[in-house]
Protein backbone atom coordinates (compact mmCIF):
# COMPACT_ATOMS: atom_id res chain seq x y z
CA UNK A 1 0.00 0.00 0.00
CA UNK A 2 1.33 3.45 -0.89
CA UNK A 3 -0.75 6.17 0.73
CA UNK A 4 -0.12 9.47 -1.03
CA UNK A 5 -3.71 10.63 -1.19
CA UNK A 6 -3.56 12.04 2.31
CA UNK A 7 -4.49 11.05 5.81
CA UNK A 8 -7.54 9.01 6.72
CA UNK A 9 -10.54 10.69 8.32
CA UNK A 10 -10.26 10.73 12.11
CA UNK A 11 -11.11 7.30 13.50
CA UNK A 12 -11.45 5.74 10.04
CA UNK A 13 -7.99 4.20 9.61
CA UNK A 14 -8.05 0.55 8.69
CA UNK A 15 -5.45 -2.19 8.53
CA UNK A 16 -5.90 -5.24 6.30
CA UNK A 17 -6.31 -8.59 8.06
CA UNK A 18 -3.55 -10.17 5.97
CA UNK A 19 -0.07 -8.61 6.36
CA UNK A 20 0.88 -6.10 3.69
CA UNK A 21 3.63 -3.47 3.61
CA UNK A 22 2.65 0.18 3.78
CA UNK A 23 4.30 3.48 2.85
CA UNK A 24 2.61 6.69 3.95
CA UNK A 25 3.62 10.18 2.78
CA UNK A 26 2.60 13.47 4.33
CA UNK A 27 3.62 17.08 3.83
CA UNK A 28 3.90 19.15 6.98
CA UNK A 29 2.37 22.29 5.44
CA UNK A 30 -0.61 20.44 3.94
CA UNK A 31 -3.80 22.06 5.26
CA UNK A 32 -6.06 19.99 2.97
CA UNK A 33 -5.21 16.62 4.57
CA UNK A 34 -2.81 17.53 7.38
CA UNK A 35 -0.40 14.84 8.62
CA UNK A 36 0.01 16.33 12.11
CA UNK A 37 -2.87 18.65 12.99
CA UNK A 38 -6.20 16.85 12.91
CA UNK A 39 -8.28 19.79 11.69
CA UNK A 40 -8.07 20.60 7.97
CA UNK A 41 -8.72 24.02 6.45
CA UNK A 42 -12.18 22.87 5.29
CA UNK A 43 -13.21 21.71 8.78
CA UNK A 44 -12.74 17.96 8.27
CA UNK A 45 -10.87 16.00 10.94
CA UNK A 46 -8.02 13.70 9.92
CA UNK A 47 -6.06 10.99 11.72
CA UNK A 48 -2.50 12.13 12.51
CA UNK A 49 0.04 10.24 10.42
CA UNK A 50 1.92 9.08 13.54
CA UNK A 51 -1.24 7.32 14.80
CA UNK A 52 -1.70 5.47 11.52
CA UNK A 53 1.96 4.42 11.50
CA UNK A 54 1.74 3.29 15.13
CA UNK A 55 -1.35 1.17 14.45
CA UNK A 56 0.20 -0.49 11.38
CA UNK A 57 3.58 -1.24 13.02
CA UNK A 58 1.79 -2.64 16.09
CA UNK A 59 -0.52 -4.84 14.00
CA UNK A 60 2.45 -6.12 11.97
CA UNK A 61 4.49 -6.62 15.17
CA UNK A 62 7.50 -4.70 13.81
CA UNK A 63 10.50 -5.20 16.07
CA UNK A 64 13.11 -2.86 14.55
CA UNK A 65 13.19 0.65 13.17
CA UNK A 66 15.48 3.18 11.57
CA UNK A 67 15.14 6.91 11.08
CA UNK A 68 16.89 9.11 8.55
CA UNK A 69 16.75 12.79 7.79
CA UNK A 70 17.40 14.14 4.32
CA UNK A 71 18.16 17.84 4.00
CA UNK A 72 19.10 18.28 0.34
CA UNK A 73 17.38 18.92 -2.02
CA UNK A 74 14.38 18.70 0.35
CA UNK A 75 13.93 18.35 4.11
CA UNK A 76 12.40 14.92 4.67
CA UNK A 77 12.25 12.50 7.60
CA UNK A 78 11.91 8.80 6.83
CA UNK A 79 10.99 6.30 9.54
CA UNK A 80 11.23 2.67 8.50
CA UNK A 81 9.84 -0.17 10.64
CA UNK A 82 10.93 -3.69 9.78
CA UNK A 83 11.42 -7.21 11.12
CA UNK A 84 7.64 -7.46 10.97
CA UNK A 85 5.24 -10.35 10.32
CA UNK A 86 5.93 -12.05 6.94
CA UNK A 87 8.84 -9.63 6.32
CA UNK A 88 6.42 -6.75 5.71
CA UNK A 89 7.47 -3.16 6.46
CA UNK A 90 5.94 0.17 7.43
CA UNK A 91 7.53 3.39 6.17
CA UNK A 92 6.59 6.95 7.06
CA UNK A 93 7.83 9.83 4.89
CA UNK A 94 7.29 13.37 6.20
CA UNK A 95 8.15 16.29 3.92
CA UNK A 96 8.86 19.25 6.21
CA UNK A 97 8.47 22.01 3.60
CA UNK A 98 5.86 20.89 1.07
CA UNK A 99 2.11 21.46 1.11
CA UNK A 100 -0.79 19.67 -0.61
CA UNK A 101 0.93 18.65 -3.83
CA UNK A 102 0.50 15.41 -5.76
CA UNK A 103 3.89 13.71 -6.36
CA UNK A 104 4.89 13.95 -9.98
CA UNK A 105 7.48 11.91 -11.90
CA UNK A 106 9.61 14.97 -12.52
CA UNK A 107 9.76 15.93 -8.85
CA UNK A 108 12.69 14.89 -6.71
CA UNK A 109 11.91 12.15 -4.23
CA UNK A 110 9.26 10.11 -6.04
CA UNK A 111 11.59 7.11 -5.70
CA UNK A 112 11.31 7.41 -1.91
CA UNK A 113 7.74 6.15 -2.15
CA UNK A 114 8.68 2.97 -4.00
CA UNK A 115 12.09 2.07 -2.54
CA UNK A 116 10.70 0.57 0.71
CA UNK A 117 8.48 -1.80 -1.27
CA UNK A 118 10.98 -2.75 -3.97
CA UNK A 119 14.13 -3.18 -1.86
What is the predicted function of each stretch?
Residues 1-7, 20-23:
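A conserved short beta-strand
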Residues 4-12, 80:
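Substrate-access "cap/lid" subdomains that shape
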Residues 12-17, 34-38, 104-107:
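Short, solvent-exposed loop/turn and secondary-structure capping segments
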Residues 13-31:
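Short N-terminal signal/transit or membrane-insertion segments
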Residues 22-25, 47, 57-119:
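C-terminal catalytic histidine-bearing segment of alpha/beta-hydrolase fold enzymes
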Residues 28-31, 35-38, 97-99:
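Acidic beta-to-alpha connecting loop that harbors the catalytic carboxylate
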Residues 35-47:
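Short, flexible/disordered intra-domain loops and linkers
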Residues 52-55:
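Alpha-helical scaffold elements adjacent to nucleotide-binding pockets in ATP/GTP-utilizing enzyme cores
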